[in-house]
Amino acid sequence: MARTVFCRKLQKEADGLDFQLYPGELGKRIFDNISKEAWGEWQKKQTMLINEHKLNMMEPNARAFLEEKMSAYLFDDVEPTIEGYVPPEK
Protein backbone atom coordinates (compact mmCIF):
# COMPACT_ATOMS: atom_id res chain seq x y z
CA MET A 1 0.00 0.00 0.00
CA ALA A 2 1.28 3.44 -0.92
CA ARG A 3 2.34 5.84 1.79
CA THR A 4 0.17 8.96 1.98
CA VAL A 5 0.99 12.45 3.24
CA PHE A 6 -0.90 15.69 3.55
CA CYS A 7 0.88 17.59 0.78
CA ARG A 8 1.71 21.15 1.84
CA LYS A 9 2.04 22.25 -1.79
CA LEU A 10 -1.25 20.78 -3.05
CA GLN A 11 -3.12 21.08 0.27
CA LYS A 12 -4.56 17.56 0.03
CA GLU A 13 -3.89 13.95 1.00
CA ALA A 14 -1.85 12.28 -1.74
CA ASP A 15 0.67 9.50 -2.35
CA GLY A 16 3.94 10.29 -0.61
CA LEU A 17 7.42 9.81 -1.97
CA ASP A 18 8.79 6.26 -1.76
CA PHE A 19 12.06 7.40 -0.17
CA GLN A 20 13.91 10.60 0.73
CA LEU A 21 15.06 12.08 -2.58
CA TYR A 22 16.98 15.07 -1.22
CA PRO A 23 19.64 15.02 1.51
CA GLY A 24 19.60 16.68 4.89
CA GLU A 25 16.92 18.38 6.93
CA LEU A 26 15.24 19.86 3.84
CA GLY A 27 15.07 16.37 2.35
CA LYS A 28 13.35 15.03 5.47
CA ARG A 29 10.88 17.92 5.35
CA ILE A 30 10.14 17.19 1.68
CA PHE A 31 9.71 13.46 2.38
CA ASP A 32 7.30 14.13 5.25
CA ASN A 33 5.24 16.91 3.62
CA ILE A 34 5.37 16.71 -0.19
CA SER A 35 3.53 14.29 -2.49
CA LYS A 36 4.82 12.48 -5.57
CA GLU A 37 2.59 14.71 -7.71
CA ALA A 38 4.00 17.96 -6.27
CA TRP A 39 7.57 16.62 -6.53
CA GLY A 40 6.97 15.82 -10.21
CA GLU A 41 5.71 19.37 -10.78
CA TRP A 42 8.85 20.72 -9.10
CA GLN A 43 11.10 18.56 -11.30
CA LYS A 44 9.57 20.15 -14.41
CA LYS A 45 10.17 23.65 -12.99
CA GLN A 46 13.70 22.67 -11.96
CA THR A 47 14.51 21.53 -15.50
CA MET A 48 13.23 24.82 -16.91
CA LEU A 49 15.30 26.82 -14.38
CA ILE A 50 18.46 24.82 -15.14
CA ASN A 51 18.01 25.37 -18.87
CA GLU A 52 17.02 29.05 -18.68
CA HIS A 53 19.89 30.00 -16.38
CA LYS A 54 22.34 27.55 -18.00
CA LEU A 55 23.18 26.17 -14.56
CA ASN A 56 26.10 23.81 -14.05
CA MET A 57 25.00 21.53 -11.22
CA MET A 58 28.63 20.86 -10.29
CA GLU A 59 28.85 24.47 -9.01
CA PRO A 60 27.80 25.08 -5.39
CA ASN A 61 26.20 28.43 -6.30
CA ALA A 62 23.93 26.74 -8.85
CA ARG A 63 22.86 24.09 -6.33
CA ALA A 64 22.18 26.75 -3.67
CA PHE A 65 20.11 28.77 -6.18
CA LEU A 66 17.99 25.72 -7.04
CA GLU A 67 17.59 24.71 -3.40
CA GLU A 68 16.29 28.19 -2.57
CA LYS A 69 13.81 28.07 -5.47
CA MET A 70 12.74 24.52 -4.54
CA SER A 71 12.04 25.39 -0.92
CA ALA A 72 10.09 28.52 -1.91
CA TYR A 73 8.05 26.59 -4.50
CA LEU A 74 7.22 23.59 -2.32
CA PHE A 75 6.63 25.30 1.03
CA ASP A 76 5.94 29.02 0.44
CA ASP A 77 3.87 28.71 -2.76
CA VAL A 78 6.28 30.98 -4.67
CA GLU A 79 6.18 30.25 -8.39
CA PRO A 80 9.68 30.53 -9.93
CA THR A 81 10.02 33.17 -12.62
CA ILE A 82 10.87 31.51 -15.92
CA GLU A 83 11.17 33.93 -18.82
CA GLY A 84 8.63 33.26 -21.56
CA TYR A 85 6.77 30.58 -19.61
CA VAL A 86 3.02 30.98 -19.12
CA PRO A 87 1.52 28.44 -16.71
CA PRO A 88 -1.51 26.55 -18.03
CA GLU A 89 -4.96 27.62 -16.88
CA LYS A 90 -6.36 25.46 -14.07
From Swiss-Prot:
Name by which UniProt lists this protein: Probable Fe(2+)-trafficking protein
Function of the molecule: Could be a mediator in iron transactions between iron acquisition and iron-requiring processes, such as synthesis and/or repair of Fe-S clusters in biosynthetic enzymes.
Example of a GO cellular component annotation carried by this entry: cytosol
GO BP annotations, alphabetical order: cellular response to oxidative stress
SUPFAM superfamilies: YggX-like
Keyword Iron: yes
Family of this protein: Belongs to the Fe(2+)-trafficking protein family.
Entry keyword set: Iron
Organism classification: Bacteria, Pseudomonadati, Pseudomonadota, Gammaproteobacteria, Alteromonadales
Pfam family of the protein (one): Iron_traffic
Gene3D superfamilies to which the protein is assigned, alphabetical: Fe(II) trafficking protein YggX
Matching PANTHER family: FE(2+)-TRAFFICKING PROTEIN-RELATED (PTHR36965:SF1)
GO molecular function: iron ion binding
InterPro entries: Fe_traffick_prot_YggX (IPR007457), Fe_traffick_prot_YggX_sf (IPR036766)
